């Protein structure tokens, strides 16, 4: 990745976990932060428990107050009752941008049959793109190369409104 490609862009990484994850223990969130930084994207980090209202509140705060162009979530996209990240994301976006989530599912499916179980969504709130990544560090590492090449164009498009 050429770090000059994304200079000036800012992202938030939001980890969703059943227990408030300590930053040093958050492999998936830290992987996303590292990928962003390697790509020259300034990154802020936050975590929240797997409560739909808490996730929605964090997404709104990050999109509306932190001047981030992207929010990358990790966790809460599976099939358990507590996996509510997609619902919280749908609660706050203005419109869907399904290609990101679809590409993540396709890439995940190439590595494991379980890749079809992720329910992640993606969409736009204001001028911020929100993408749900799976909670597995391995799935994050496999999915990032599918998403990253599109970010410059996505940012430019969002900037135009």
Q: What do these predicted regions represent?
A:
Residues 1-161:
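Non-catalytic beta/alpha edge segments that cap or flank active sites
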């Amino acid at each position: 990745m050429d770090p000059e490609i994304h200079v000036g862009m800012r992202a938030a990484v939001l980890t969703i976990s059943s227990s408030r994850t300590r930053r040093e223990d958050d492999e998936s969130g830290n992987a996303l932060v590292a990928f962003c930084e390697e790509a020259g994207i300034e990154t802020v980090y936050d975590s929240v428990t797997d409560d739909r209202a808490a996730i929605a509140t964090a997404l709104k705060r990050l999109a509306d107050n932190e001047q981030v162009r992207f929010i990358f979530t990790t966790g809460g996209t599976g099939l358990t009752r507590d996996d509510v990240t997609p619902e919280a994301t749908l609660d706050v976006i203005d419109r869907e941008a399904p290609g990101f989530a679809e590409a993540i599912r396709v890439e995940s499916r190439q590595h494991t049959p379980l890749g079809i179980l992720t329910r992640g969504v993606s969409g736009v709130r204001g001028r911020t793109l929100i993408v749900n990544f799976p909670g597995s560090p391995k799935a994050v590492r496999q999915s990032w190369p599918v998403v990253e090449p599109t970010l410059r164009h996505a940012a430019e498009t969002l900037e135009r409104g």
